[in-house]
């Protein structure tokens, strides 16, 4: 038996104003070893709290207010304890401001793994890992003179007001990876599979709106959920055909099911309200890889390979398409064809290598630059 544990705490005030960090983490591991069997229980995680500094500052704001200045959580008040300097009609002006003291990003994550490895004999080995990850996070923001039309549950005719909002997410990820390996003479085989399930609801609430009572604020101003099932099967072979000559091949089948529903945190218009989300897509991927390598005089290795890789769109690919695509259309999955040719020279005190490759993409998902 073996036991290991560790606790860590890191804190910093940060260089940027109100950019402090408070990071706590832990690790625990228990292991059992008995001949050809190993069993491990591993748990690690942490909690982070950091000040929001996303907005940055213009060159003029930094010149007038210092390099550490930013406007996150800032609001104007007649008796504020802080000064904000700006230019108007060529003259430097001063305003009194204060800062919301809980303008923070908060996240908790806990990872658990159960790992099994067993060697049946000289030819067969088995490896399996079960895992579960839990996460919960939110950030709080003070918004000065926010447009209230974007918060659709408010019962008011007021168009702008100061408010405090929270954006929240909770995620669950669980699954199993398993593989077996077989080795005999000049042939090495491996095969296995994995399955994972991911769930991640997102929602937002208003903690306070200037001038409104609690009953006027309403419930969640956006609320959406995501379910993702990801499964794959694979087989891999390495065959030493002759001295210095090796053939290798991989085959993978992957299935992805992705559902998302609800409303996103993007305000579209008075008619539509918040951006609707309605995604139900399934993907079937076959990813082969094959190649050959030849070692000459021990120090020279030549190789040639071909591979296919495919990837489903991300959550942001699905949500962003609403602004640019017709209804009920979805982004395509990416596909990559990769050819590689290479040479490597290895000596006790010197290693040299050259790699030529050609990658052909189909339906590649790339940033457009639009904001």
Enumerate the language-model features and the residues they cover:
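Extracellular loop and loop/strand-boundary signature of outer-membrane beta-barrel proteins
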Residues: 12-16, 23-25, 97-102, 111-115, ...
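Residue-level signature of outer-membrane beta-barrel architecture
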Residues: 1, 31-34, 118, 181-184, ...
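Surface-exposed extracellular loop regions of Gram-negative outer-membrane beta-barrel proteins
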Residues: 255-270, 280, 294-339, 351, ...
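Acidic/polar loop-and-plug regions of large Gram-negative outer-membrane beta-barrel proteins
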Residues: 38-113, 141-163
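Flexible, surface-exposed loop regions and adjacent strand-edge segments
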Residues: 21-25, 56-66, 71, 142-153, ...
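Transmembrane beta-strands of outer-membrane beta-barrel pores
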Residues: 9-13, 34-36, 45-49, 132-136, ...
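Transmembrane beta-barrel wall of Gram-negative outer-membrane proteins
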Residues: 1-11, 17-53, 112-122
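Face-selective signature of the C-terminal outer-membrane beta-barrel domain
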Residues: 106-268, 293-295, 353-354
């Amino acid at each position: 038996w073996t036991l290991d544990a560790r606790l860590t705490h890191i804190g910093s005030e940060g260089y940027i104003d109100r950019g402090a960090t408070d990071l706590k983490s832990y690790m625990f591991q228990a292991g059992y070893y008995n001949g050809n069997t190993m069993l491990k229980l591993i748990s690690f995680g942490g909690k982070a709290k950091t000040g929001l500094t996303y907005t940055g500052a213009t060159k003029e704001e930094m010149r007038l207010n210092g390099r550490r200045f930013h406007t996150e959580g800032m609001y104007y008040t007649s008796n504020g304890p802080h000064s904000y300097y700006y230019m108007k009609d060529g003259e430097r002006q001063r305003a009194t401001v204060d800062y919301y003291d809980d303008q923070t990003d908060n996240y908790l994550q806990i990872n658990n793994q159960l790992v099994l490895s067993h060697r049946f004999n000289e030819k067969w080995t088995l490896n399996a890992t079960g895992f579960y990850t839990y996460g919960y996070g939110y950030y709080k923001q003070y918004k000065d003179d926010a447009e209230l039309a974007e918060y659709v549950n408010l019962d008011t005719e007021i168009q702008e007001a100061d408010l405090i909002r929270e954006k929240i997410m909770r995620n669950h990820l669980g699954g199993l990876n398993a593989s077996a390996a077989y080795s005999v003479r000049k042939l090495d085989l491996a095969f296995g599979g994995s399955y994972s399930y991911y769930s991640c609801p997102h929602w937002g609430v208003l903690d306070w709106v200037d001038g409104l009572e609690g009953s006027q604020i309403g419930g969640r101003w956006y609320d959406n959920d995501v379910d993702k099932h990801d499964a794959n099967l694979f087989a891999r072979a390495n065959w030493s055909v002759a001295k210095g000559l090796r053939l290798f091949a991989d085959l993978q089948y992957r299935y992805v099911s992705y559902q998302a529903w609800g409303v996103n945190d993007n305000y579209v218009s008075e008619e539509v309200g918040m951006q609707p989300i309605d995604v139900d897509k399934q993907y079937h991927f076959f990813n082969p890889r094959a190649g050959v390598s030849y070692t000459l005089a021990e120090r020279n290795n030549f190789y040639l390979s071909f591979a296919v890789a495919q990837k489903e769109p991300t959550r942001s690919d699905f949500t962003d398409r609403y602004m640019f695509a017709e209804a009920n259309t979805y982004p395509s999955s990416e596909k990559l064809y990769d050819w590689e040719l290479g040479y490597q020279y290895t000596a006790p005190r010197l290693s040299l290598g050259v790699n030529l490759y050609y990658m052909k993409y189909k339906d590649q998902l790339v940033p457009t630059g639009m904001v």
